[in-house]
Amino acid sequence: SGSATAEMLHFLTACIRYGVSVCIAGSTGSGKTTIMAWLLSNVPNNRRLITIEEGSREFDLVKRDAQGNILNSVVHLLTRPSENPALNINQDFLLERVLRKHPDVIGVGEMRSAAESLSAAESSRTGHTVCTTIHSNSCNSTYRRMMTLAKRKYNMDDSILMQIMVEAYPIIVFTKQLEDRSRKIMEIIEGEDYQDGRLIAHSLYKYEVEDNVTDDRGETRVVGHHKKIGLISDSLKKRLLDNGISNKELEEFMQPPKEVG
């Protein structure tokens, strides 16, 4: 199978379209940015999309017709680092100003600092749909990674920060480059809450590696498949419905777990 199944991609697209923020986690070269760019390219043309990137611009999401007329509402922003604090334009600075433009969807290239971590989370918790990426080793450790970033600057209790992150990003996607250099979405989870020092989350989809087969030339091929593990919670279902998804579209994600792909 490919990096994900059609159902998995449809689910993630529906989340972004219907107001559920998504964080894509993984190491360098795992395909995080590629997946994020694909998801943002599927934002409906009538939604206002603003992206914020650091360093170089990787997104080009402006759509045009055959005559070159722009079809969608997209603004791409880049940071401009400076030693002079008065001239330094970082992601946190841009995020604050982006919110005044009333975007429907915000794409934050990557969360690297404490300020970005909390600013992006607060943007999501105040009704904006955020799609971002972060370096992390698994779905479940992603929330703790966000919390650790935020702790570098903000003297807040761990449990409060964890609750903020879980509320801000109900959906976490973990990507990985496997031994044969193929890139897979390894897992999608739904985070529901953080109580008594424990993350309450459940897996929705997983990629299960069955074997790593080496041929006569010494090249490895990964054998595996994607599997549907669980269903979205009633609260996420209600949120999607409240934000405009049809029961027909929702039905696909409510089918009992089975082998997919």
What is each residue range found by the language model?
Residues 1-18:
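P-loop NTP-binding catalytic core
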Residues 19-25, 40-167, 176-177:
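Switch/coupling sub-region of P-loop NTPases
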Residues 32:
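Conserved lysine of the Walker
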Residues 187-261:
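NTP-binding/hydrolysis catalytic cores, primarily Walker-type P-loop NTPases
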